Amino acid sequence: MAPKKAEEVVESPPVSSEEEESGSSGEESESSAEVPKKVESSQKPESDSEGESESESSSGPEPESEPAKTIKLKPVGTKPIPETSGSAATVPESSTAKRPLKEAAPEAIKKQKTSDTEHVKKPITNDEVKKISSEDAKKMFQRLFSETDEIALLQGIIDFTSTKGDPYEDIDAFCIYVKKLIDFDATKNQIVTKLQRLKKKFNNAVKNSLKKGKTEDDIEFAKDLEQKGFELSRKIWGSNGVLVTGKSSRKKVGGTPAPKEMKLVAHSTPKKQQEEAKKPERTEAKVVNTGLSIGKEIASFLNADNGSSCGLDESTLTAVWAKVADGAEKREVEEKWKKLKAKQFELCLQRSGLVNETAKMIFKAYES
């Protein structure tokens, strides 16, 4: 059995040299230094094996040993090669294995950033936009003063005028007084604009009723709160309202001064024309003022023509007129006064135009 092991070692060098020649140039450089050593060591057993083979040639048959040599040479020759190639190949594998880790780090960061941005920037749907727009529209057109606030505001005007006076003269104190009665913290401008709208609403309701042939007593509303608000507005801005009678009593007797054009006519015309022009000037100048009450209109008319012979002043006439029952007849008289004032305005405009024409003619005659 010993000679068979020796024969296996003898034929290993030639097989390894053939595989090294077919390999890469880098492996040939590394294996070239090791091959001579193996060849030298392998040559010694060849001599021994040759002697043993000669001695055994007579004893054993040769053809049985040759196929055993060829079968076992391939694994013996290939054993040192994978060790060198494996050691050389493991180095680049370790270097290349680290690179995907470095490249994977920024990719993971990018994924985190994209996931964060997707989480933050959510797309807004059409339903959400409609909800937002509807909420904004409700806030824009939301009613500040409720119906109960309007009634409290009107009642506050009546109470304030009875205790402290006209709210328009001391509007700051009135706003402080009314804020306690309203459910929200209203500003001064909001309160003033609301008063103007309530007054306009009352006047429009009265005008519409008069067009239909009805009086203030006949005006009715479907809701109880609206009816109550109208009754309070009537106490404030009606013919016998607190603010209407208060304004008339606070004004002085006499109207606005006559226009300058009227004075020019008086100085430029002859005596007869002066006498005819003076009488209507006084009466019309007194009556044209739209802010006057009916009592003051009558007082100014009587005092303009008769002086103090009647013994009637503005306060007594306004007080007596306030006692007149509020009804259809009283409303008709007030409407007639309004129409008369409108006609007086038209007459005043016509007269001013006539004055301008006469003044131009006088000026031309004076220059010539």
Curated annotation (Swiss-Prot):
Residues 84-97 have a biased composition (Polar residues). One of its GO terms (biological process) is regulation of DNA-templated transcription. Residues 17-31 have a biased composition (Acidic residues). InterPro entries: GEBP, GeBP-like_C, GeBP-like_DBD. Keywords: Nucleus. Its main location: nucleus. GO terms for molecular function: transcription cis-regulatory region binding. One of its GO terms (cellular component) is nucleolus. Changing residue 348 to S: Decreased DNA binding. Loss of DNA binding. Residues 1-123 are annotated as: Disordered. It is found in: Nucleus. It holds the Pfam family GeBP-like_DBD. Belongs to the GeBP family. Mono-, di- and oligomers. Associated with the Mediator complex. Interacts with MED6. Interacts with MED10A, MED28 and MED32. Interacts with DEK3. This is GLABROUS1 enhancer-binding protein-like. It comes from Arabidopsis thaliana (Mouse-ear cress).
